[in-house]
Amino acid sequence: MTFLQAINSALMRGLEHPKTLVLGQLVKYGLGGLTAGVFDRFPQQVITYPVCENLMHSSAMGLALAGYRPVVINERMDFLALAMDSLTNHIPVWPQRQAMKLPITVVAVVGKGKGQGAQHSKNFTPWFKMLDGWTVHEPHTPEQAYEMMLYDLTVSDKPVLYVAHREFFGKTVSVKLPNPKRVGLCGASSRHEATFYSNPDF
């Protein structure tokens, strides 16, 4: 099983609960495999949005408050910048102020890879690690990708940023994850590397 297939499998498993919803732009069309088959199996649990990131994430908060478990798919992390009012001033703050559960999973793809360009390859993960109220899950192996996603969709009752590195999508064996020391264009910030191992039979 590849990294991408692991995410998709966990997503399918989570959607077996009728209160779990998938939100995002073009999510019904598969997004290169990330949401493949989701609309075919769970058409009533898929909400497709126009290009309006702040609307997507603020409505996800409303759905969570209404008892749903929304999963917001962002094909590129770069455009989370357009939703920062929701992502900084409301979603992480509400559970702390109101002592309420807010089970929102924000999936953000870091688009490093050939042909991605400067506006489709940034990694804002450090921002969210500095914000109170967010749990950040950044899987490195197919096993972690599956287990973290399934946990977020079935157990967690808090806002989670789930970071999916596009360069991992086809991987089933040892891979290297570049860890930027500061936010910047992929390849433009100083970084160190660590090797993470996965079971090739997974």
Predicted regions mapped to residue ranges:
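Short, acidic loop-beta-alpha module within alpha/beta folds
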Residues: 193-202
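Thiamine diphosphate
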Residues: 1-183, 193
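Acidic, proline/serine/threonine- and glycine-rich low-complexity intrinsically disordered segments
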Residues: 188-190
